[in-house]
């Protein structure tokens, strides 16, 4: 069970001096502002028992002059110490659109931009701590844990782009991980309450039908795919995966098409990586 008290949701609003203007036992001092959240955690523990895992998600910093800062977030974490099994440390506030791209880091931020918050919280509690924030590379995740910055690493959008990241990391196949481009395509569909979509994972939502998302073809055919851009490469990969004999032709001297100029800027390196992943899969197919 995760009890979410970050990002401007209800518990987060109680914690924040900006939103919480109450004058009773649930407002004023930090102890009072945290009372509702702590009582909820205690009620969950009473309901599920001592052996059931509970995660509390908090902000390490609202990143706002008027919100709850790191010092108070540390004190909230101390209040949770021993009451939960894991403290998940995020940041930001959905009420401020400018902070959305820090809560869910965009491509303009380095991978793991929010890890420092979990690392600071970890210094003050005995409960295991998890970090979040635009993590995609197993090597970086291992470095974070080995360096003592966090006990666990949690990923969200990265698993939408490639649900098999843990398995590929275990098999030492990190080079085949489809990188999340941090383009927010998945968020747009979530807001519209539609099936989630992903710019780099055409199989999203189809994993229940088969691991590869597409069943083998009933009849093997010889197929010509014209154009070695991202669409052409993915078409060739999918066709080959279904058992067809595929020929992929491209007029340029390299595969990738517009992914090359699209991934040229320093903050678009994920696109360049995605291009190379597709090229590798074409050669393997």
Locate the predicted segments by residue.
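Flavin-dependent oxidoreductase catalytic cores
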Residues: 1-226, 230, 234-246, 254
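Beta1-alpha1 glycine-rich phosphate/pyrophosphate-binding loop at the start
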Residues: 224-284
């Amino acid at each position: 069970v995760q009890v979410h008290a970050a990002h401007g949701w209800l518990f987060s609003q109680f914690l924040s001096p900006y939103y919480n203007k109450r004058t009773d036992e649930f407002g004023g001092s930090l102890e009072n502002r945290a009372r509702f959240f702590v009582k909820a955690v205690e009620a969950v523990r009473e309901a599920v028992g001592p052996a059931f895992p509970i995660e509390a998600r908090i902000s390490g910093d609202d990143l706002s002059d008027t919100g709850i800062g790191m010092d108070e977030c540390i004190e909230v974490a101390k209040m949770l110490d021993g009451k939960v099994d894991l403290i998940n440390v995020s940041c930001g506030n959905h009420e401020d659109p400018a902070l959305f791209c820090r809560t869910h880091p965009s491509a303009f931020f380095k991978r793991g931009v929010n890890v420092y918050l979990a690392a600071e919280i970890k210094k003050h509690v005995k409960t295991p701590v998890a970090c979040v924030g635009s993590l995609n590379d197993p090597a970086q995740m291992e470095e974070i844990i080995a360096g003592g910055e966090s006990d666990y690493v949690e990923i969200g959008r990265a698993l939408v782009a490639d649900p098999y990241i843990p398995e590929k990391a275990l098999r030492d196949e990190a080079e085949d991980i489809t990188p999340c481009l941090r383009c927010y395509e998945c968020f747009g569909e979530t807001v519209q309450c539609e099936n989630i979509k992903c710019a780099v994972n055409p199989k999203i939502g189809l994993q229940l039908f088969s691991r590869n998302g597409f069943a083998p073809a009933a009849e093997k055919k010889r197929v010509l795919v014209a154009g070695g851009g991202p669409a052409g490469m993915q078409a060739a990969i999918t066709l080959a995966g279904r058992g067809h004999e595929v020929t992929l032709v491209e007029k340029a001297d390299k595969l990738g098409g517009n992914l090359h100029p699209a991934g040229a800027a320093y903050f678009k390196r994920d696109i360049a990586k995605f291009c190379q992943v597709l090229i590798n899969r074409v050669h393997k197919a």
